[in-house]
Amino acid sequence: MLQQDSNDDTEDVSLFDAEEETTNRPRKAKIRHPVASFFHLFFRVSAIIVCLLCELLSSSFITCMVTIILLLSCDFWAVKNVTGRLMVGLRWWNHIDEDGKSHWVFESRKESSQENKTVSEAESRIFWLGLIACSVLWVIFAFSALFSFTVKWLRRSRHIAQTGLKVLGSRDPPASAFQSAGITGVSRCPGHPSRKFHQVDINSFTRITDRALYWKPAPRLSSPPLRAAPGNCQQMAPARLFLSLRLWAWRGGGESPNSRGTGEPGPKFHLASGMH
């Protein structure tokens, strides 16, 4: 009994020490983390506003691009480390084992009973609505830029909307992983409501993205080496062959084609035309 109780205590340990005091609170439709909820929407909504009003706020495309990247980088960090664990009790990270292999770990906060819920319904709605709606808006921006032939804005929206694919395929996820990266990480946690729809072999998908991101051209097929006798000209390197011919000409060795078989040496060659 004591061993079983100790195992139960080990399994029920909260993900975060600061949240142990909230495990016995009932699940209510109120916002218990207003600061986390505010910043969960602030960074992503601010990035969308800057994208829409960029031409009015600044004439520099680089300034707008850097501002959006910084806002979405802060949003990714907040979703992964703060808002995900506080608002919905989900988190994920990556670690490398002793063999040098990279492993993704996805966890969710355990709930002791149906009466003692640690996730607020209001915060859960805010979290998922902000996470999905803003990503859909970036996809809409990408298609609108495509049909309006605005290439520079299309490039911006495309990089933001497709970052999740890069994160899954990369060994070391960059800090600039944005919108879809948060959806990908949170949706793979065990406590996600739509977890049953994510039964696809993610390892195969990761291998595909690895090949797409770290693609290298195939080596050229070289012809088989010529099987020539040792000392043959076909086996010698070009530079070595050239030096051998120059040395042979300088020494005046060999026989000329006209004197072949007569034993008479051929004409002598010199390196400089003025030497006799």
Curated annotation (Swiss-Prot):
The Gene Ontology CC terms held by the record are: Golgi membrane
Q: What is the recorded membrane topology of this protein? A: Multi-pass membrane protein
Residues where N-acetylmethionine occurs?
M1
Signal peptide position in this chain?
A: none
Biological process (GO) annotations? protein secretion; vesicle-mediated transport
Q: Which PANTHER family match?
A: GOLGI APPARATUS MEMBRANE PROTEIN TVP23 (PTHR13019), GOLGI APPARATUS MEMBRANE PROTEIN TVP23 HOMOLOG C (PTHR13019:SF23)
- According to UniProt, the name of this protein is Golgi apparatus membrane protein TVP23 homolog C
- Which gene underlies this protein? TVP23C
